[in-house]
Amino acid sequence: DMLYSTVQKGGSTPVITRETDYAIRLLRTLADGERHTAAEAAERELVPQPFAYKILKKLSKAGLVEVTRGADGGCRLLADLEKTSLYDLMEAMGESCRLSGCTVPGHRCTWREAHGGCTVHCHLAAIQEKLNGELKAHTLAEILRESG
């Protein structure tokens, strides 16, 4: 699908999880600035409703959308998609793209403690920094913009 690749036995691990892919889709519907019901957005974007509610709750908690309950309720976009990066969305979804556990800040590595350093860590950390930079360089507006 849009950015999501299926994890299969012997396959690849996606950088963008299904939940983040669904979040991008829901934001696509909300990008018109109008108020939409969660059910309407879910149906329009082919996102299963239970996922849509869970995702919209996370997006609301992160301040990206406003969710109003009740008869006149619904959800609408609060975030400026021109200033919200893919990295920001992944963080809002509680995800981070990590090459290795050793690139997680504060990770305790017994190898590095025993040997005083690790060239593998140095290389992975440099690659991780570039990957984070790339995720931060692409806004949701850019990703959602119609091409052609």
Question: Model regions: which residues?
Answer:
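N-terminal helix-turn-helix DNA-binding core of bacterial DNA-binding proteins
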Residues: 16-47
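Non-DNA-binding regulatory cores of transcription-related proteins
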Residues: 78-148
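Residue cluster at the C-terminal edge of the helix-turn-helix DNA-binding motif
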Residues: 61-64, 92
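Alpha-helical residues within the helix-turn-helix
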Residues: 43, 60-61
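Short, intrinsically disordered or compositionally biased N-terminal tails of bacterial proteins
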Residues: 1-14
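Beta-hairpin "wing" of winged helix-turn-helix
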Residues: 63-78
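Short, hydrophobic-biased segments on the C-terminal half of alpha helices
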Residues: 27, 56-57
